[in-house]
Amino acid sequence: MWLMDNRKLINDFLDNYWLSVGVSQNTLNAYRSDLIIFDNYLKQNTDKDFKSLSKINIENYFNKRVNIDMSMSTQARIMSCFRKFFQYLLDENYIKENPIVNFKLPKKDKKLPVHLNEQEVTNLLEAPDISTTIGLRDKAMLELLYSCGLRVTELINIKLNQVNVYNEFIMVSGKGNKERMLPLSNSAMETLQKYEKEVRPNLLNQGKTNAYFLSNRGKAMSRQNFWYIIKRYANNIGINKPLSPHTLRHAFATHLVQRGADLRAVQLLLGHSDISTTQIYTYIHNTILKSQHEKHHPRG
């Protein structure tokens, strides 16, 4: 009964949230996972269900989650999910008080994202064998990802009508369906021209899809497939850093800041709604400068 009741509340909340806000499927999947994991934790560690929680139960949960090295961004997402979920329970009269009101996340040191230096990025972009159909496709995807600092979801969701390889710009749809126009680097533009002319028609064969990047079977490329592609090439060239699907996006922003780009311009290119999100790349830049100073200064 407990499990069914809690899972029904989760499903009802997600249905309501989707209908009222219209968020992406990725966000809904993440929220569902966050709430199910929390539900399992409650079942294993307490005698509480969602309707009888106190603030201390949530504090204990977050303290335990922090101890398993959860990233700040993941913590923030879970907190956002919990705030919306418990407000929904309050609005629907399932609970009388919101246990998460005025709750603050446990403090944790800021963790800078892993980034690749310019030579490592060059090596990664040159790893695909462009004499092959698949290699040229992979090269085009990697070039575009780094050229524009795209999120992987933005990359794989690009449609044919969003790319004009002769206009030197692409249109992408980011979080909240916000569109932004992004300039293409010369190398990305040249590779995309070859991909459109020589590769995509072969991958499409007799199929029909307006997805720009296609899998080996002529279907739209998936996040999982592209993540596998990145890891495979990184392993092939000996990059041993812990990578993520956002690694080239981080490299894009870090290298722009290192070369003197205005932070607000970087914010617009990345599609960040708040410049405080972009400021992490100034910290990375300063960390690199400090490391170089300590390494090369005679009294460092």
Regions found by a protein language model. Give the residues of each.
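Conserved catalytic core of the tyrosine transesterase superfamily
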Residues: 1-300
